[in-house]
């Protein structure tokens, strides 16, 4: 798998092995220090994922998280055990995911690959979101798209049923054919 990852150098004991594991997984990596020009580093690396190795309470980390969010890059934090409350950090920094130290570098590489896959699936379908529910919907779309069968998408008004149907159509073998949305609620029961 290819992908671009930016790693902070706040904790080199974690960052260097993680960098090696990501490169071994076929990802392009760049390491950035809090003393670097963060905006230039993000522009240069064009990351799909930013991995924070520490110092999340400091201003450079918050700035980098905001820059990553502006560029729609996923944000993965490696947290100290018993340290920061993940829920508050997710809200404050807009994190996509987190892992608690110590962890194996391969575990970080796996998490980064999942984030890249999720981001690419969101780009292909046009359905955006970082929640587990949205990720589950995206996985279901990808599973159902190759099936050569009629699919009924149910849900409350305004939940994006047509968007889901269009995403399935765009990923299917029938994508070259016209997409026709049908409001099944408007059809008489006897017709169905």
Predicted regions and their residues:
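AAA+ ATPase active-site-proximal loops
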Residues: 123-192
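N-terminal accessory segments that target, anchor, or regulate ATP-driven/P-loop NTPase machines
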Residues: 1-123
């Amino acid at each position: 798998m290819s992908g671009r990852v930016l790693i902070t150098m706040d904790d080199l004991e974690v960052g260097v092995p993680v960098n090696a594991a990501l490169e071994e997984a076929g990802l392009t990596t760049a390491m950035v220090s809090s003393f670097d020009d963060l905006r230039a580093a993000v522009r240069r690396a064009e990351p799909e994922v930013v991995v924070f190795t520490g110092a999340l309470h400091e201003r450079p980390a918050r700035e980098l998280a905001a820059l990553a969010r502006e560029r729609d890059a996923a944000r993965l934090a490696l947290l100290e055990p018993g340290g920061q409350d993940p829920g508050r950090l997710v809200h404050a920094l807009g994190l996509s995911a987190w892992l608690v130290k110590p962890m194996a570098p391969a575990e970080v590489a796996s998490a980064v690959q999942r984030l890249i896959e999720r981001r690419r699936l969101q780009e292909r379908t046009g359905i955006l979101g970082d929640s587990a529910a949205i990720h589950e919907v995206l996985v279901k779309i990808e599973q159902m798209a190759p099936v050569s069968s009629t699919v009924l998408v149910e849900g409350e008004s305004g939940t994006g049923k047509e968007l889901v149907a269009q995403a399935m159509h765009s990923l299917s073998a029938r994508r070259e054919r016209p997409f026709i949305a049908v409001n099944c609620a408007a059809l008489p029961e006897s017709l169905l």
